Amino acid sequence: MNRINILDCTLRDGGYINDWEFGKNNIYKIIEQLYNSNLNIIECGFLDPLGNNDTTRYNSFETINSIIGAITKKQSSCKFVSMIELEKYNSKNLPILKSNNPNQITGIRLTFRKSAIEKFIKIAKEILDKGYELYIQPISTVSYTDKEILDLIDVANRLKPSVLYIVDTHGSIDWHSYNLKRIFTLLDNNLVDDVSIGFHSHNNLQLSYALSCELINISTPRNIIIDSTLLGMGRGAGNLHTEMICNYLNTKKIGKFDELNIIDTIQKYIEPIKNNNAWGYSVPYFLSSSNICHPDYVSFFLENSKTFVEIDKLLKRIAPNEKLEFNRKIAKECINEK
């Protein structure tokens, strides 16, 4: 693995924009184009027992592995991964990884809330026992205290995953006041050496690119994985742009990404989606970040025709322990509160 690696998660995190309905041919083409652009890791979607194999929220690896197998014709270190949400894990749905063939899903990104750490440990062990690389994805890492981060590191050191992530679920982290540097330093100083550190950001404060560049330039021998999407595709303000971060790494002579192929992919397969489903910076999603609130609260208030000023006041009414996960009942109570 390179020291700095880009994980494109367009087909998974970008799917919140179009309900993961990219279409079979477009799924094939996007994976093919990303592979030929020399992306380090491609996230191919969610493994979901209630999913549909015509989308990138699929219920088995059969279809997606057949696509990967049809594409991978050249020598490459590119890896293919899928995400599983802890509460949707079904052991029968995850097959044993039967061979050392890299041209298939070989890594699982497991998301979990810190209240579910014991269940997470149990399922993480199952995933590792089935032969997959494990990517630990703690939802809203910003909400962890230093003690909780150190406890999580202890769990990771015992599990020996491939990657432990810093996940900025609500796009509220910055370099100083929410201390991305502090969290990274805790991980870097205490994780065993062969565990990579990942960073998954959301662009609500327009800081995804700057923060990613800061991490890339940290002096450490540890491998770092940066998540991004084509054209920043993602709900609300979107994500770090794959085309921008690949350009940055190429300019610094760290990456060897095919930038023309990347922008061709955007024009052919992502721009048409954006024409019908907009994403990107907006004041309401800036407010969700500045109030450290789940963006679905903002979506709910917008659906109820609230102004920007009203949204900010409503977000401030939500108790801190209710902000990190959307609760429709709480949102309605805020609106009805006089």
Task: Explain the meaning of each model-derived region.
Residues 1-338:
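Catalytic cores and adjacent flexible loops of soluble metabolic enzymes
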